[in-house]
């Protein structure tokens, strides 16, 4: 997996083409991350290098100004090659997209957060939804993967 220097998103960025390039690279490592039960740091670095962590930030604050539907396509394409990368990335993305939406539609005071995400390339994390303390599940290793039985209240 190659790691280039970080680039700022440019107006007119072809996010889907960039996602396809990253997906092709992370596909080879997906099984490794799953079998080692390790964080998808390589995929995260590639996403950061291409400016994806600021993609949902409005352009006027230094972000990539990607739309919601296009970001969903990006996450879908990543998920087809490495579900763990797509899931971890979506946990950041939904927080930034929500802050951008609230700024645009509710005039919420999220400008400071959005500017910092863009300027500092911050990665945000979330708890994963509603009452995660009552979530439970079991993952049993099987030949060729895992059998997962779980309950999550959204």
Question: For each of these PLM feature ranges, what is it?
Answer:
Residues 41, 45-49, 54-154:
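Glycine-rich flavin
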Residues 1-73:
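Alpha-helical interface subdomain recognition
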């Amino acid at each position: 997996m190659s790691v280039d220097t970080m680039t700022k998103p440019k107006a007119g960025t072809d996010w889907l083409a960039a996602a396809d390039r990253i997906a092709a690279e992370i596909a080879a490592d997906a099984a490794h991350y799953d079998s080692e039960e390790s964080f998808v740091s390589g995929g995260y670095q590639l996403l950061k290098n291409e400016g994806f962590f600021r993609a949902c930030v409005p352009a006027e604050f230094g972000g990539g100004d990607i739309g919601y539907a296009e970001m969903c396509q990006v996450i879908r394409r990543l998920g087809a090659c490495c579900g763990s990368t797509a899931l971890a990335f979506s946990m950041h993305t939904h927080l930034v997209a929500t802050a951008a939406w609230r700024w645009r539609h509710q005039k919420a005071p999220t400008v400071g957060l959005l500017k910092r995400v863009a300027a500092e390339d911050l990665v945000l994390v979330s708890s994963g939804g509603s009452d995660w303390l009552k979530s439970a599940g079991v993952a049993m290793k099987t030949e060729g993967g895992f059998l997962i039985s779980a309950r999550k209240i959204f």
